[in-house]
Structures are given as structure tokens and as C-alpha cells.
Amino acid sequence: MAKSKKKTDVVDSTNLPILELLSLKAPIFQSLLHPELPIIITGFGTGHIVCHRYDPAKLQSHLDRRRRIDTATTGKDAKKGVCPWIRLDIDLETGDLKLVDIEEQHQQKQTGKDEDLGVKTLWKTKRHKGSVRAMCFDSKGDNIFSVGSDNVLKKANTMTGKVVKKVNLSSLFNSEEKKNDKFTKLCASQTHPFILIGDESGNIHVINSENLALSNSIRSIHFGDSINDIFHFDKRSAYKFISLGQTTLAYFDVRDKDAKPNVAGNEDGKILISDDQEDEVLCGCFVDPEVADTLLCGMGEGIVTVWKPNKNDLEDQMSRIKISKDESIDCIVPTLQDDNCVWCGCSNGNIYKVNAKLGKVVEVRNHNELDEVSFVDLDFEYRVVSGGLENIKIWELSSDDVEENASVESDSDEPLSHSDEDLSDDTSSDDETTLVGLSKEELLDELDKDLKEDHQEEKESNSKSVKKRKIMKENNKKKDLYEHGIKKFDDL
């Protein structure tokens, strides 16, 4: 019985994507979500970069309408296998977006007009020779940095795509060996004008984000192995960062010149290296970056390791959470919902919501049955976004968040109380009685009337919680900017 109960703890999510972007002709290598706007930027194996703006309310409305149609339509009228969310193929030659689903295309032809799908292309460009290797926004999202297999770093305006600065990174190094290094990761400081770029030889270079000049290099951090991930440790200092490579985690200060790892024979080294994990460390993030007391790392053998910097200064993991045996955890991002959770992207095509406090998976969503999940991110309203070589999915906000917001604002003056399930059952049965028998056009009109009211209430509810989190984030950022240089050291 105990074993059966354990299985039911993992919930297969009922949440669906509001948008799916597909690339049927070129592999997707990287995708970024703007921190403050509904903008997604995608880099491809062909060197192209495309920027799209989407309307979350319109996309959610379309999804809800399809759900209600599926509920109200019975018998022969039911459409099996019809995808309820918008699916668009990206044409890299023209930048156009084309509906993938035949049912949606047929509906547009019948109406005789192109429906506003809630997504538009802002710009597209052939940015790099070869593939796009890494991308990142600056702290405000005004500019985007990208590096390709051509070893050229470019800084461009986010809204227009126009390049404002570029540099051939090979020209910054004297050694012929270093000139041929390929780059794997980009990470921008949120408080200072510099970015970090990691390469396949385990080096991290500090680049001035204004003029793209080389400021410093931290070499051979992971004993010559590739940099898998880089992220900020600003709880300790604005200049402290963590990198992951091969089977170790490293912690360093970007200002240190000629820093060496603190290994046997060099115990005074300024780069703190963890114990050998005997498994590749692929990705990592803090559960709550503002508190930074718990760090989770995705591993090559399907587990997530838990690290506590305040306990042992990141010398070794404290515990582990099993996710999926014989698979790899390739990407990870915090939910930023004050729920002690992170999202993990797995090589089996699933994304897992992992509760670090409980030490277990609490939710599973399927991104792709055939392709691995190579990146996860959050959009400006904290929707999770998953991506692989073939497609990108922007998922709807969790129903838990919507219910939580609704419960806070609800009145307790009702003479009789009903459960949410009872109310939803009553509503759905009413809809079925009213809508069955109508033509498809009449059915859509009736549903649109209801959805307009529902989405206005939902939008107001969601905006309040999002605005609150953004205000807290902005206040913390302002605090960081005005604090003294030795701020937040745990020992002081």
C-alpha cells in the first residue's frame, strides 16, 4: 500500500501549453524569454535568430474556447486528435508563422479572413555563420548578447534586432589554442556592466558589456572540461559566480587575477572546487535566488543533487532527489512562486516540478514524446517555457495559482458553501445543455461571450500576484545597487 501511495504523489499535470512554436526545417539551439515583456527570442542551428511577441490573454482565450468546444461537442461531431492550443511553424526565410493544424487552417478558409493568432514576428536575421551557441539578455532586457560557432559575440537591440556592437572573440586571445576554443554559455551580471562567457576548455572570460572588451579570464576551472552552466551567487557578492563542468561544481570571484583551483598541492587556490560527484553536473539553479540557501543541480544519471552553501560551503552535495533513471537532467529553473520548487527538463521529453523541501517530484508535464528537453525558462508572468530541437512550448499558468488568487479575493458571505469541484460540474453541465445542437459558428459566438468575462477576472487576479512579485524583485535589486561592496557576506 505504501508503494502505491508513493506513486500517486506524482501528479500528471492537466495544464496545457497556450502556444507551441515549431521548427520543421532547422534545429532550435536556444531560446530566451524577456524578463518584463511577452517576447521570446529563438536561436537556430543555421545561425538565424528570430524574435516573436505573443499575447498571453488571446492565446489562453483560444485554449479555453477549444476546451469548451471539446466538452460541449459529443458523438459524431467530436474531433479526435485536434490540438487545443495554437501551433505555429517558423519560416526562417520569410519570418512568417504558419498554422500547423489542418483543422485551424480549414476554419480560417471558411471565415474568409486570417484570424489574429496572438503571435507576431518582430524581427528575424541571419546573425551568425554556423550555429547559435548561446544567448542572454542584459539585466533590463534592453539588449541581447549572442555568440555563434563563428566565435563572434554580438550585442543587439532587443526590440529591433539591430547590432550595436560586435567582436571576434578569437582576437582577444594571444594563444593559438585559445583562439580555436568554442563557447558554450553566456551569463550577464544583473547589477554590473559585464557578462561571463564559458568555453569548451573550462575557461570563463569576463567581458565588459558596454564595449565588449576582455576584462579577466578564469582558466581551467573544471580541469579542462567544458563549462556546462554559469549562474550568479549574488547573496555572497555581486562578483561571485558558480560554474558547473564535468563532475564538479566551482565557486569563484570574477575579479581574481590568475586564480587557481584549490586542489591537492594548491590548497590556497581561490577557485573553490567541490568533491568529485562521479556523475556529470549538467545544470543548476538556486531554489530562491534571493535567499540562496539551497542549490539544485541536474545530473547525467537522472537525479537532482541538493547543495547547502551555508552548511559546507559547496564542498559536496547534501542529498539527492530521484527524477528518472537512465536519463539526464539537462536544464533547470526555479518556479519563483515561493513554493520551494524548480522545473527540470529531462532527456525523456518531460519537464518535472521538483519540491526541494519535500525532496520529490510533485508534477510532470510532457513536452515531446520523441525529443529531449534542452532548455527551460520562465516568461514575464512566470509561465514555464520548455524547448528542444524541434519545438518550444509556453505553458499556461498553473491552476493552483489561479485558485489561490481567487480564494484570497472571494467573499465569505455565501449562505451555503460548495466545493470548487461541485461548482465546476454544475457549470459544465449547464454549458452542455445550452450549447449542444448549435452550429459551430453559434457555438463559438456563445463561448466567446463567456470567455471575455472569465478572462477579464482571471487577468486582474493574475496581474495582482505578478505585480507583487515584480515589486519585491525591483526593491531587492535597488537594495543591491546601493549597498556597500562587502555586502551580504555570511561571515560578517
From Swiss-Prot:
Compositional bias segments (type: Basic and acidic residues): 449-462
Ranges for the WD repeats: 127-166, 178-217, 236-274, 276-317, 365-405
InterPro entries attached to this UniProt entry: WD40/YVTN_repeat-like_dom_sf, WD40_repeat_dom_sf, WD_repeat_multifunction
UniProt keywords, alphabetically: Nucleus, Repeat, WD repeat
Main location: nucleus
Bias (Acidic residues): 404-414, 422-433
Annotated spans, Disordered: 404-472
Keyword Lyase in annotation: no
Alphabetized Gene3D superfamilies for the sequence: YVTN repeat-like/Quinoprotein amine dehydrogenase (2.130.10.10)
Cellular location(s): Nucleus, Nucleolus
Gene Ontology CC annotations of this record: nucleolus
UniProt family annotation: Belongs to the WD repeat WDR55 family.
Subunit structure: Interacts with BRE1, BUD27 and GIS1.
Protein's UniProt name: WD repeat-containing protein JIP5
Gene designation per UniProt: JIP5
